[in-house]
Amino acid sequence: GKALRDGAISMAESTWYKYARKLGYSEARKPEKKTRKKGSFNASRPNETWHMDISQYKTLDNVIFYTYTVVDNFSRKIIAWDISTKKCSKIRTDTVKRAIKNEFDITIGNQSLDLIVDGGTENNNKTIHDFIKNCEVTINKKIALKDVTFSNSIVEGPYKIMKSYYFRSKEILSTTIYEELKFFIEDYNNNRPCHKHKIYTP
């Protein structure tokens, strides 16, 4: 390129690039291929793998809320949830406790599962660590795209549906968001067909 512009080489531009390709010079200009993030993971049974995350939502009256969910990988069901104006480890831990009670109850002993989280401090802190350490259920907490190759998109999916299809056309206020969220979760779990299960709900 520069040699042609400076007149140091006398040949057609197309000829120059043809020889440059043969000699491998053009390869250096190609950008490196980025490593593609791998997709999610499909569990083979219910309560084999759970995903948890927190999503932020600002209401029409400018109040920020945090929605906490735990989603079962196999069924795609939201098995525990909460909502608060606070982002804290206690609420996060309480949702895991609730998920365990909802799913195992009297069969709580001799159970084990993988818990997939993102790398944020809301999912990785002493409160969560201490609970997992002393829990009757064996919980293997793993960070998505770090401890495992797949993402945490399973738990992010319901949030996207909630915001795009349930909340977008409504005037969500701080006084109504709890009931709106409750309706969404009940509808998502019991009425809305899940893509993975085709015509069936989680």
Regions found by a protein language model. Name each.
Residues G1-T49, H129, P202:
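Basic, flexible linker segments flanking DNA-binding modules
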Residues N47-K58, T69:
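Two-metal-ion RNase H-like nuclease active-site motif
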Residues L60-Y66:
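Short, flexible loop/turn motifs enriched in small residues
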Residues V63, W81-T107:
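Active-site beta-loop-alpha junctions of metal-dependent nucleic acid enzymes
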Residues D72-N73:
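Short, acidic, Ser/Thr-enriched surface-loop or helix-capping motifs
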Residues K77-I78:
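Hydrophobic "anchor" residues
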Residues V117-G119, N125-I132, K141-S164, T175-K182, ...:
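RNase H-like two-metal-ion nuclease catalytic core shared by retroviral integrases
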Residues E179-P202:
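Charged, gly/pro-enriched flexible loop segments at helix/strand junctions
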